[in-house]
Amino acid sequence: MPQFQRTLVTTALPYANGPVHLGHLAGVYLPADLFVRYKRLQGEDVIHIGGSDEHGVPITITAEKEGITPRDVVDRYHSMNLEAFKRCGISFDYYGRTSSELHHKTAQEFFLEIEGKGIFERKTEKLFYDASACRFLSDRYVTGTCPICGNTEANGDQCEQCGTHLSPLELINPKSKLSDATPELRETLHWYFPLGRFQKQLEAFVGSHDDDWRANVLNYTRTWLNQGLNDRAITRDLSWGIKVPLQDPEAEGKVLYVWFDAVLGYVSFAREWAVLQGSPDRWKEYWQNPDSRVVNFIGKDNVVFHTLMLPAILMAWNEGRSDSIYNLADNVPASEFMNFEGRKFSKSRNYAVYLGEFLDKFPAETLRYSIAMNYPENKDSDFSWTDFQNRTNGELADTLGNFIKRSVDFTNSRFEGIVPHACSRQEWDSLGINWADTIHQLDEAFEGFHFREAVSAAMDIARAANRFLTGAEPWKAIKEDRDGAARTMALSLNLCHALSIALYPVLPETANRIHSMLGFQGTIESLFKRGVPLYKSLTEPALPMGHSLSGESEILFAKIDDAMIEPELRNIERLLAEAQAREAGATAEKMEFKPLIEFDDFQKVDLRAASVISAEKVKKASKLLKLQLQVGSTTRQVLAGVAEHYSPEEMVGKNVLLVANLAPRTIRGEVSEGMLLAVEGDAGKLYMVEPQGEKINGSSVQ
């Protein structure tokens, strides 16, 4: 791996339309903080940049629902999330906002640079327009019936019921969310970024990281590359956002699409950080100096925005330039998802534990440790209240906290709070800890983004320390061998110091409390020195004979009893009941049915038995299968949103029920001539309705 002089760490920008939950913390913000704190501990030059994504349609929809302005919405959630991050010890060097003046300026500079090179393409397209509201409708402002599953409340970008990604034009009976009127199609012009123009450059860029990027990142990215990259709109008809910076009548009423604007926050926020340092150009050292490294921490749902789209934007900027050339990301350590009690976190379904609410009840350090030990590196992991309780009580309170308190208390009471003996290197190496191997393991784990391994290796020191103190029994030995007890306590206190260093990335507050109990002035952060890695100091005992402790000790971790967890477990039962009721199409109180229809209306629906003769996946649509059906003497092509529930092989040969007289629809460039019937079961699982009987193909349902 190349040796870099400095590192810029960025974290995906949380959307300022709601509070962050534990899934966000586990996937992005805690791993980034662990990495940054490790780098600082090692004396490296690193800055940690984050901020709020404050533009986009969901924010304007929330504002309209609440009767407030979009600025009111983003102000609320920016402050809420920043405060939650601070309470959790997430150590940003700068946390910005995409609504800031400098961010607007930065995004517009990128637009003008790329526009000036003739890279963007202008395309006229037809979009829905609400005549009564006098505005074009973005996808989230259109609702209608999903052409895949029949959900009558599908959004213009995605059906929440079956998960299919849609465009507003694919909806059946579309309605405007602004007026409930049927929108009309009108022509509008938009700017497009030609991703395909950079396909070969992006393939080379991704290929250069075959050996150091995670498999999930490479797989997600190559899926897009293998399908071929298409043009992507970078402007929208919207009032809230960054104005298209052109003196052109066709640019009136248009803003930059949030996917283009948000990722440039990493640049603008670094610029804002540099201004606060009193050196406005210092940000260039991190973004444009070839000996600097950029690391983007994200969740797996954001991969292609950071491995394809942001690099393509930077490539477009760099094209033809001899100066101010941006570095592309050196690594994009995307995590998998952390689930909550076996189910995916979902803000829209209110199935989540929000960070601020959690910290109102439990200490941040216990959460940091529990999540780090369940870090979803290569596969989805799970947060459970029982696991959180067990780790807090067993590993933090009984193992780490108990060892520290016993060591400090015994020294204070029996040796006047002074390190009572010198520790030789030989004694230090005889504790059952191979310090060189431990340091190597810590370095390798942090540098490789294996945070569960890193924290576990640090906690192994606490386990070894506890075994040493328990086995030596100085409280007994002191009666006959005071010198031996003194040697034991000197080694134990030095182990306390080693733990304050080793565990600092995951437990920074606890590490500083240990540091203080050991009699040190200042904080661990005051020890940071450029080019001096503190982990290497673990190879030798640090506390000399005669060193004075503070004379005080404290319980580092209070145990969590069942009574504290019981309300959370009851709350899970309530959330699960509500989620299961929603998934079953009912409220917690009663089953709800759609409005009554006349018998003649039902008679208009032509339901036919059909059989699947072939099936294949649809490109760029992970939830769709393209099916060829035999319906009597004819064949039909139908797109069905069942790819997450049935493989193509499982569908072939099935008898199915087809809505045979549904008007054809074009979805993802493919014509769908009907709709299949399916039933949604537990956890959103779809089950095909499969008619039974002989010679029924083509027969109508009676």
UniProtKB/Swiss-Prot annotation:
Cofactor(s) the protein needs: Zn(2+)
Main enzyme class: ligase
Cofactor binding: number and manner: Binds 1 zinc ion per subunit.
Principal cellular location given in the protein's record: cytoplasm
Binding, Zn(2+): 146, 149, 159, 162
Subcellular compartments: Cytoplasm
GO cellular component, one term: cytosol
Amino-acid positions noted as binding ATP in the UniProt annotation, renumbered to this chain: 347
Molecular function via GO: ATP binding; metal ion binding; methionine-tRNA ligase activity; tRNA binding
Signal peptide residue numbers: none
Residue window of motif 'KMSKS' region: 344-348
GO biological process, one term: methionyl-tRNA aminoacylation
Catalysed reaction equations from the record: tRNA(Met) + L-methionine + ATP = L-methionyl-tRNA(Met) + AMP + diphosphate
Assembly with partners or alone: Homodimer.
NCBIfam families, per database record: metG, metG_C_term, PRK00133.1
Family: Belongs to the class-I aminoacyl-tRNA synthetase family. MetG type 1 subfamily.
Protein name per the record: Methionine--tRNA ligase
